[in-house]
Amino acid sequence: MFDAFTKVVAQADARGQFISTSEIDALAAMVSDSNKRLDAVNRISSNASTIVASAARQLFAQQPALIAPGGNAYTSRRMAACLRDMEIILRYVTYSAFTGDASVMEDRCLNGLRETYLALGTPGASVAAGVNLMKDAALAIINDKAGISAGDCASLSSEIGTYFDRAAASVA
């Protein structure tokens, strides 16, 4: 896992060059927006159970076969595993948002996840739909202007959306 600063240093070192002005400017912009980033991560983390529960309710309403007898989320044990997996993915999205880098999510959460779900017979499209529903819920919370740092959060919301998109694509 590399945070944005470590990544810039590693790239400059690999080139055998000093850190460029444009790289410094990009990092400075990231620092100036850090309060918005912290607010967003805090909002997702503080509302994680609501985000997961809301997404699960919507998913099971859209795909009732998942909770019907024989479905992948039928029985309380399977339902708990489904909710746990959704929560884990959401947690790694927050790690990526916090660091501004998806590598920790890729390495520790998504790497091999599709193959695991295939081996278990879990429909990847349903998992991806659940991730997209979490994305919608999380972005709605992030974009709620009440009680957050002033300023435009469109770029940060877009960035966080890409982390959800990566997670959904990795299991679909």
Curated annotation (Swiss-Prot):
Signal peptide (from-to): none
Keyword Transmembrane: no
Coiled-coil segments: none
Gene3D superfamilies cross-referenced by the UniProt entry: Phycocyanins
Binding site for (2R,3E)-phycoerythrobilin: C153
One GO biological process term: photosynthesis
Keyword annotations of the record: Antenna complex, Bile pigment, Chromophore, Electron transport, Membrane, Methylation, Photosynthesis, Phycobilisome, Thylakoid, Transport
Membrane topology (UniProt): Peripheral membrane protein
Domain of life: Bacteria
Major subcellular site: membrane
Record PTM text: Contains two covalently linked bilin chromophores.
Transmembrane helix in keyword set: no
GO cellular component, one term: phycobilisome
Residues modified as N4-methylasparagine: N72
Location within or outside the cell: Cellular thylakoid membrane
Residues annotated as binding (2R,3E)-phycocyanobilin: C82
Protein's job: Light-harvesting photosynthetic bile pigment-protein from the phycobiliprotein complex.
Alphabetized PANTHER family for the sequence: C-PHYCOCYANIN BETA SUBUNIT (PTHR34011:SF7), PHYCOBILISOME 32.1 KDA LINKER POLYPEPTIDE, PHYCOCYANIN-ASSOCIATED, ROD 2-RELATED (PTHR34011)
Family: Belongs to the phycobiliprotein family.
Quaternary structure and interacting proteins, as annotated: Heterodimer of an alpha and a beta chain.
Name the UniProt record assigns to this protein: R-phycocyanin-2 beta chain
Species in which this protein is naturally found: Synechococcus sp. (strain WH8103)
